[in-house]
């Protein structure tokens, strides 16, 4: 397939006024298109949804998902990795940590820990790569004496959400904030009265809109390279901030518990 950005520019003389608005928006906001709906694009470009559909047809594209895939492929061609592999990875990881740190709001962080500290029980929701962050969070907080349950599958998340109350908290990990199963479970938990803390890159996402506290990550979910772990690194940075703030507030208890855990683990070594 031809580079979609080149195709958009090559057809410029044939565009109507509405086409040019859509084309300009796509070229300017290509990094965000993969997380937008047809209605989002139309609204931001200042045209009707029908105008967006007609524009896509001119490109030979029938569905929005095909545009998103084309953009993801073309972006990869546009920004190939350069230099030694280890240096490229180091730069990517360094950038994502630095940028996530710049987005961290201390007041929101403290508010999130307040909710967790005074809750009856805490659940961590996440699927796929975000599930790794949720599972890591469970392990971290249990070691500090805070009962946390990580649920990594959508059906089980719904079951857990149905039994929550206003005394409970759900921490939801989702880079896009629009993962269907997780968002549905979070919405049900909110309906039951539970407080929602979201860890997401998109503060205007479906998940963020129903959250009591939003802790923003920097990494974007990629369609083509969804296996990259820079998104996970960003989530783990936020998780570690939560853990350290909780530990600071409960140091006496967590120190004693860590000593007991250390003894228990050492006793299992051969």
What does each model-found stretch correspond to?
Residues 117-237, 243-250:
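Glycine-rich phosphate-binding loops that contact phosphosugars or nucleotide phosphates
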Residues 27, 72, 117, 259-263:
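Short amphipathic alpha-helical surface patches that mediate protein-protein
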Residues 4-8, 141:
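Gram-positive cell-envelope targeting signals
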Residues 3-5, 13-24, 28-35, 39-111:
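HTH-adjacent hinge/linker in prokaryotic transcriptional regulators
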